[in-house]
Amino acid sequence: MKHCFAIILSLVCTAGLLIAVNGCHKEDDDDSISNTLLLRGTTMKINMALFAQYDDAYNFDLDAGGEHGVHGYGGFEAAWIGKTTDLKGPFFMSFNPQDGGSSIDPVIKSGTVKITEVKGGLHILVEAVEENGQKLKIDVLAEDEFKKNWD
C-alpha cells in the first residue's frame, strides 16, 4: 500500500512539475515560433534542423555551408527569439575545420546573442569579446528547414 501511494504521489508531482515548466516557457498562449525558448541543452545545425540534445551544456553548432563549422558551449542557458540575451563567460567556442584539421578554441569573456524570426527562417547574431580582448562575430541564417524542425 505504501508503494502504491509513493508511486501515485510521484506521478502527481511529476505532472505538476511538467505543467509548471511548460507554463514558464511561453510568454502567451499562441503557438508562434517567437515564443519558443532555446533551452540549455539544445543543439542547432544551420541549414538543417534541431538534431540532438546534450545534458551538460548549452551547445549550438553553426554551419552555414562554409569551410568551417562553429561549435559553442555554455555562455547562456536560454535565449528568447526576438530578444537579445547576454553571454556570460568565460566559456569556450570551438571553430572546427570540416577537413579534420586542428580546432581554434577562443575563450569568450562576454557578449550577446540575438535571434530574430525572418522570412525564410531564423537570423542568429552572436557578438562577443574574447578574454584576450579580440572581438568575435557570428552572423548566420537558419533557413526554413531548420524552422520546420524546430518543434
Label every PLM stretch briefly.
Residues 1-22:
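Sec-dependent bacterial lipoprotein signal peptides
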Residues 5-6, 12, 34, 41, ...:
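A detector of low-complexity, intrinsically disordered, Ser/Thr/Gly/Pro/Ala-rich segments
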Residues 38-119:
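Surface-exposed helix/loop patches within compact recognition domains
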Residues 89-90, 123-126, 151:
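Short, well-ordered strand-loop elements centered on a beta-strand within folded domains, enriched
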Residues 31, 127-151:
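Edge beta-strand at a domain terminus
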Residues 107-131, 135-137:
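Extended, loop-rich substrate-binding clefts of extracytoplasmic carbohydrate-active enzymes
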Residues 31-34, 57-58, 119-125:
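Short, hydrophobic/aromatic-rich segments at coil-to-beta transitions
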Residues 16-45, 150-151:
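Bacterial Sec-dependent N-terminal signal peptides
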